[in-house]
């Protein structure tokens, strides 16, 4: 804000209205309360006019005293002040006439209520200024001789006021006033200095004096740092205006020129002045010095240049505007503030009114002058219709936009956001390529709840254009956006991390995995699988499992195992990976073309590379999880096709889920696992590995023979040429003996022995048949160990008698007794040991019988002494009837039944 008032903007807000009425040339004082004007003459004549300068009442005061000052206490009460010469000539008498409105009549009529007279020990100098304190209603009078006299009390009561204290400054007083901010400080201006009087404490504020009628109180100070509605004491001097606040701090504004009269109405300051002779700084400095005293003022008056006629200036202090300026014929002018303007009384007693234009006209004029901010403030101050104010805001925003001040323009568009044409505004800023300002508007639409899905998409497009990744994520987190189009915008712009974040926010797991697989973030894809709840996992596993098996077979297999074994629970702790984003496509070509506002815009910002910082997944996903989630895995058969050409992973998968699989699925799993073993065996070129997998196949059949589909095993074994599987099924289907006979007929002793070892425990006759097979062989030299094994099994399990065993062995001419002597000796030893154990058991039984018989005999024939005196059950003294047992225990008959409770024996 400029402190040089002449640099303020100018606008004419007042109109001159001539008044035909003239006032009495003998008028000595006048005052106004805004609605009424009071004129008083030197002979005690008082005239009251309304704001249209129509005479309402004439009053003649007693003694025809010269009225020197008029003070309005309120709109219905005013005081007249006069200072007349006393009886001795060395003192004077102050007369205060109190007038009040008689009733509510129209037009108002005032009557004299009371008169107060005070004697002053001083020459009768005229009363220059009067003012009333807003706190204690103290009335201060300033005299031309330098005396300040204060009166306290109620002036409408007889003897209601008294002279409380006085100060003699010794300098002619030119003005005094109390401020309207509940302050008790009295500001006093003299010809040489400026003072403040608080109680009886006098302080000098400035060593520069003020001319007569050039000081006043002011409710507005033209400085933004000031407190609102803070009152000031304003003085106008040749150098400019000085404002003093209640804290005695001052603010100066430059306005060179000789000042003659000043008054204030609200925020409008009216000033009569004569322009300076020069405009350079040296001339202004000389004027400051020449106007520092009353003598210099007189010199300046004498040398006044008629080429510079006096002017009347109206300044709006609150808005820093010059609102009217015009020429006057003479400096001898008086200005009265009215409610809607000023009343100007010229030297020839002519009167004209400066009337303020209407509110609507003022706002219209401000808009024409491009002062939209002032027009808006005025409309708000006057509580005008909100729609009208918003129309002003829109016009101001449009003006700022045309001027190129896009930031300020957007500020005002945002303030009137509820009434603007949003598509048009968006289109304007798109054309101007002001993406950041457009972002501000769209963000405000979201805050105020006015945003549609299209607005959110446009905002997302703008964020993408300026590569504002954090803002993209915040917008995604807000939601309420068309997912498909938003995903397309991010995906087509290669913002894969943001596209993934969007898909996560909308719980679209398939899109998340699309992004991860597309960007070859296979490990991240697996971590995302781990984070999902089981209910969402199956279709995604079936869709992406094959790709992930090709890239990360082991980890992918583990996820399948967890899911199909009912151990998957999901994990919220997965984090988004870092990634460098590719160059963004043109805004026009990719995403803004999707929106209704971009059909005219044709622009694109230069592409660049940037990185997305990692962040945690959204809290909203927590709703999908629960600590006690329970689910039932589907049949493993649903994913078998995923493991095509991944036989090793299929084996790991089946082995992993088998322990926890449902009984309903174990047959399927075992059968499939058997096939996988066989295929792995035939796929290997290493003989050891082939034997290893074939052994696992046979071992599996033995372990889970009850949970395997024999028909499928038989079919698989036949197709893949696995004879062991075929024979296993034949054995389980009752064809074991036939298979064994075929081995014997072919002299395939190894396979026959293998079959005996496999099926012998279930079909023990195979051992006997195997022994017969050995007996029929011509050469048994390499089979003696196996023969002994078979013989031992037959003997240990007593499958046949020793005689039958010898008969079978006797059929062979090649099997000698010495070769199986150990086995036969073992048979004999077993028989001897068995007979010995049986004899020992018989002898022990006999001894036990003899001992028991002896004890029974003693119990039947021998007497015994009863020494118990208390019942062995209840512990109470025994009494008849009682029962005694030979074991030494005694009972009441009621406490026992048929046998001793403690011993339980006869």
Curated annotation (Swiss-Prot):
CDD domains: RING-H2_Vps11. Keywords: Cytoplasm, Membrane, Metal-binding, Protein transport, Transferase, Transport, Ubl conjugation pathway, Vacuole, Zinc, Zinc-finger. Pfam families: PEP5_VPS11_N (PF23341), TPR_PEP5_VPS11 (PF23356), zf-C3H2C3 (PF17122). PROSITE patterns: CHCR. It is a peripheral membrane protein. Component of the homotypic vacuole fusion and vacuole protein sorting (HOPS) complex. Component of the class C core vacuole/endosome tethering (CORVET) complex. This is E3 ubiquitin-protein ligase pep5. The gene is vps11.
